[in-house]
Amino acid sequence: MNHHTRPVLLVLGAGDRAYRSFLLQEFAARHHLVLLDDQVPAWTRPYVTDTVTVDLHDHQAVHRAVTEIALRQPITGVTTYLEHHVELVARLAKELGLPGADPDAVAACRDKARTRQLLAEHGVPSARSVLVNSADEAVAAAAAIGYPVVIKPRGLGGSAGVHRADYREHVSAHYDNAAAATLIGLEASAVAGVLVEEYLHGPEISVECAVRGRGDVHIAAITRKRLGSEPAFLETGHLVDATDPLLDDPALHHVVTSAIKAVGITTGILHVEVRLTRQGPRIIEINARLGGDLIPLLVHLATGISLPQAQAALATGDTPDLAGSVAQSAAIEFRYPTVTGPVQAAHARAFTADWLERLFWTRQSGDVVVAGPHSTINDRLAHAIVSGPTPDACQARLDQVMQSLTVHITSPVRTTACVR
């Protein structure tokens, strides 16, 4: 594509470099990017053509900024990879007459209570769920559903404030935790409330989907999730295999497609979380955005498919390229602290291998981290990404990399909230 003919794509929010630089890089491969953000990070400069500093929580200010941009140059699409801004992007696209998901459908994905309601109305397998507004209501809901239950915030993500409760005495504490949970500012735009839900037994996956019209859902990849010890549900790693047998599973495809139709999404890249129970696949959440935790990079390494480029194509009315060009596995593992306190030192032994795609420290000397069971994603010390011919090969390679890491932490100190 000629550099001068690339379409202009508005991007709302940059996010954290460790987790988001790959996405912005892929957007920039085929589009001129105009980035709008509260504060534009320096790391974004190689990827963007123009930047606009604006408070993204002030929607009127954003509308004025977008109007001014449109007067200077034609805008062909608007997108984001941040949960914070998916509703605003949908509204902007609708007002500008650009391709995009219906704002009400996107809002339904962000509101987990509304998601459950729509899934139930359309007969899509999910979890029984009750919206509660007090600890007493949570106790009553748990008794009605039956233990164990999951208690979670209505509008957050990243497993923030999500806990399993096996007994009545756990419910009140977990309710208070969910009601007070925060996640990198997401609570500012999230609908308030707490859900008490049926606990679903079985492994958890995410389904990375491209939606090209109502009921036209293409499953691009299956992500196998690794979760830490309950009662929390922290994600400790992910794996994508280009030949995962679930890619051709008709029951999974039916449930995921039915769920997306139920909430009303007709275009975009979605990250749908599913539990594989004995009764079949059941929906956990529907996210109207690219998956986090560098899952799109795993998909790219394992299959050759660029989900960010596919999202940008859909946002500008183009046909996404969803053809795979690679067939292998890729995996990520997150290193969490085993001790609470400030990081004194962190280093890795000299390590070179063509299958080590990435080793990134996300905490530095002096940073305070919290050990389980109170860890959040904010406490991740590092992550490693590897590729390999099979899932087993990837796991062996991750083990090798993780054994090369050394972290010294001074303890104890008081815990801190998730702020990343």
Residues of each region from the PLM?
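ATP-binding N-terminal substructure of ATP-dependent carboxylate-amine bond-forming enzymes
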Residues: 1-105, 136, 364-370, 374-379, ...
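Short beta-strand-to-turn element immediately C-terminal to the catalytic PLP-Schiff-base lysine
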Residues: 132, 162-167, 210-212
